[in-house]
Amino acid sequence: MTASGALQPALYLAVLIGLSVPLGTYMARVYQGERGLMASVLGPLERLAYRAAGVRPDQEMRWKDYAFAVLAFNLAGLLVLYALQRLQGVLPLNPEGMAAVPPDLAFNTAASFASNTNWQAYGGESTLSYLTQMAGLGVQNFVSAATGMAVLVALIRGITRKTADTVGSFWVDLVRSTLYILLPLSLLLAVLLVSQGVVQGFGGHQSASLLQAVKDQGGSAVVEQVIPMGPAASQIAIKQLGTNGGGFFNVNSAHPLENPTALSNFLEMLAILLIPAALCHTFGRMVGDRRQGWAVLAAMTAIFAVLLVACVASEQAGNPALSALGVDQAASALQAGGNMEGKEARFGITSSALWATATTAASNGSVNAMHDSFTPLGGLVPLWLMQLGEVVFGGVGSGLYGMLMFVVIAVFVAGLMVGRTPEYLGKKIEAFEMKMASLVVLFPAITVLVGTAIAVTTEGGQKGVFNPGPHGFSEVLYAFSSGANNNGSAFGGLGANSPFYNTAIGVAMLVGRYAVIVPVLALAGSLARKKLVPAGPGTLPTHTPLFVGLLTGTVLLVGALTFVPALALGPVVEHLEMTR
């Protein structure tokens, strides 16, 4: 690893952790209803939203009512987004005359953005109108992120309350997440991105003359190029901050009008993990012990750092096939070195690998390089990060409530080892809690493995595989890992825009999102009804380095046992073939 390669990740993590503390404290105050400067400014808008929706902010919900509100609201959003896509040909703000999106692709896209996955089987600048991008995708970027944050807050209330029947109001949590957190941060980031050259406007696509004419596939001369435009900066800000990831343009943040400079690249990378990291501090403050938040953040950071080093090292080592031909792949003052296939020369190896690790540690899925072109072991890192359940930082809200399920499992395992009923923050962890935590871990994993098996054994799935052998299998495995874990990134060599993949991955995204949310809320309701148990001599401290190690081991062990056989058939075999 070069000096630059070591400095960039270190600077990134330092800034990330430094900003996460004040932001986490601020978010805790928002969810606890503490009034501050933002409340005095945005309070009237919050109250207006409640009146317009007919919501009583002081009326809390049982966990079943909370879950019903989540499902109903998200279903309504999915249907509206589907309708927008099907009708965009006759709706305004469509200067390029985009036609209606086909039914299977419209379903896939609606399921994708409603579930905070942002899997894209289309090219944004060639498929969707400005209205669909803004009123459809942009709105879902906000509310899907706010949904995950709301579910997390409900779980935290379940942990902290005693003998209570309610876990809060979904509508209040949704509005506060959007109004006080996501909107201000998105506005700030959008302005910064515009200052760096990210486009923002409603004009049609622009034409520019080429310096040198070229010929197309038919032999005709091409003398000008079309430059796509649109309201990109506003959507890019929330797609990064909300761990959504769906790009305004087809190549996402590798596009020079979506990510033009080194500063915009750093800001967009920082935005991916900012809220997930800060929510760890929010958790610590809301449970009354900040050490708990630091412990969870330490486990996340440890896994992230190790896998980041593995990804950078694998990409910097280059391609053995090119080395055999005498190609110079060493880093120097004139080149980044390593495996530069599928990467922007302006970003190089380290920034590309850092983004890939961050975007799959979180359920973001945006890219500034093509993951399909990574080396087998370099591509294994983002693949396995998703398969761990998107709990290494993870999505906004969803990452932390997923990690807390692993905390429950780790506490239970520790209790078994000492023969004592496990406890977490004064609440006994019993059979029901273990069942719910197990469902959260099992549903995405089963969806990934079953979906991959169906795809590689049926004609509809096989038609989309253009690369034979282990890499083709890796592409299918990556697609279902991305969909079921609500990430949205892809190995781009898979022909995913087909009725089979649009339907199968669409279903996988819905299962991976909502079959997880319901057990999490059920666990929250169960914990809220329990009494607090005083800590005793046999209580396992959950803020120590020992517990951080136990939690890290639990996450890695579950991920290894579940997916190592599948990984052995894909990237591991491909690596062995490449190096023999």
Curated annotation (Swiss-Prot):
Membrane-spanning intervals of the chain: 3-23, 65-85, 136-156, 179-199, 263-283, 293-313, 399-419, 436-456, 504-524, 546-566
Subunit structure, as described in the record: The system is composed of three essential subunits: KdpA, KdpB and KdpC.
GO cellular component, as recorded: plasma membrane
Protein localization: Cell inner membrane
One Pfam family this sequence matches: KdpA
InterPro entries: KdpA (IPR004623)
Single GO MF descriptor: P-type potassium transmembrane transporter activity
Claim: Cell inner membrane is one of the keywords in the record: yes
Free-text function comment from the UniProt entry: Part of the high-affinity ATP-driven potassium transport (or Kdp) system, which catalyzes the hydrolysis of ATP coupled with the electrogenic transport of potassium into the cytoplasm. This subunit binds the periplasmic potassium ions and delivers the ions to the membrane domain of KdpB through an intramembrane tunnel.
Record's bilayer topology term: Multi-pass membrane protein
Record-stated family: Belongs to the KdpA family.
UniProt entry keywords in alphabetical sequence: Cell inner membrane, Cell membrane, Ion transport, Membrane, Potassium, Potassium transport, Transmembrane, Transmembrane helix, Transport
Claim: Cell cycle is one of the keywords in the record: no
Protein's organism: Sorangium cellulosum (strain So ce56) (Polyangium cellulosum (strain So ce56))
Protein name: Potassium-transporting ATPase potassium-binding subunit
NCBIfam families reported in the protein's UniProt record: kdpA (TIGR00680)
Gene: kdpA
